[in-house]
Amino acid sequence: MTRKSVLGEVREVQLAIQLIQLGARLQFLESEVGLSRERLIRLYKEIKGVSPPKGLLPFSTDWYMTWLANIHSSMFYNMYQFMKIHSDEEKVWILIKSYKLYLQQIAAQDSEPILDFTRAYTMVRFFDSDMLQLSTCCRCSGQFVAHAHDHKSGYVCVLCRPPSRAGKARGAKRGAEGEAGALGIEGMGFGVEAAPGGAGFH
């Protein structure tokens, strides 16, 4: 085996480790990592201590429209879009770094992540397939995940017009307020126009 192929394999293993630690499913690993299915399964078991979960990947855009899911999804995708514009790295590494940044922001708010890595990856695919879009709220000017081809005029986000049930469950209101603080215009700009000095973009 040549030196180049050895180093290439090391990079693929490092990539697989990063993805598995973030919660990537086997289907995603097979599509993004240049290792055999058998090696990926062995690596997954070694890191997680269990076999990879079975089942289909999420296929509906509707989940991203629900209250807290939309807040978290919008937070992540704005970060991803910013990183994609300002980085020349491979797409998979932009995805990894954006998701880590999302987790850091959620931890800073003393909250729990709603968006897992699989749904984050699937959402990026939905955007690439023109199934989702970012719509600008006419009240706060934040950019939020919405169905593609929905009317953008007069769009009001889930923070400015939360559902009536929002906050009724114990702890939900506190969590939403934390997310709102992280997502607000005064916090991180909530868009690709955000200044590099905004939250997390140092």
From Swiss-Prot:
GO molecular function, one term: zinc ion binding
Cofactor annotation comment: Binds 1 zinc ion per subunit.
Domain of life per record: Bacteria
Cofactor entry: Zn(2+)
Classification via InterPro entries: FlhC
Pfam family, one: FlhC
Binding site for Zn(2+): 137, 140, 157, 160
GO biological process: bacterial-type flagellum organization; positive regulation of DNA-templated transcription; regulation of bacterial-type flagellum assembly
Transmembrane segments: none
Keywords per UniProt: Activator, Bacterial flagellum biogenesis, Cytoplasm, DNA-binding, Metal-binding, Transcription, Transcription regulation, Zinc
Main location, first listed in the record: cytoplasm
Protein localization: Cytoplasm
CC terms in the record's Gene Ontology section: cytoplasm
Purpose: Functions in complex with FlhD as a master transcriptional regulator that regulates transcription of several flagellar and non-flagellar operons by binding to their promoter region. Activates expression of class 2 flagellar genes, including fliA, which is a flagellum-specific sigma factor that turns on the class 3 genes. Also regulates genes whose products function in a variety of physiological pathways.
Self-association and partners: Heterohexamer composed of two FlhC and four FlhD subunits. Each FlhC binds a FlhD dimer, forming a heterotrimer, and a hexamer assembles by dimerization of two heterotrimers.
UniProt xrefs under HAMAP family: FhlC
Record-stated family: Belongs to the FlhC family.
Entry protein name: Flagellar transcriptional regulator FlhC
Lineage, uppermost ranks: Bacteria, Pseudomonadati, Pseudomonadota, Betaproteobacteria, Burkholderiales
Primary gene name: flhC
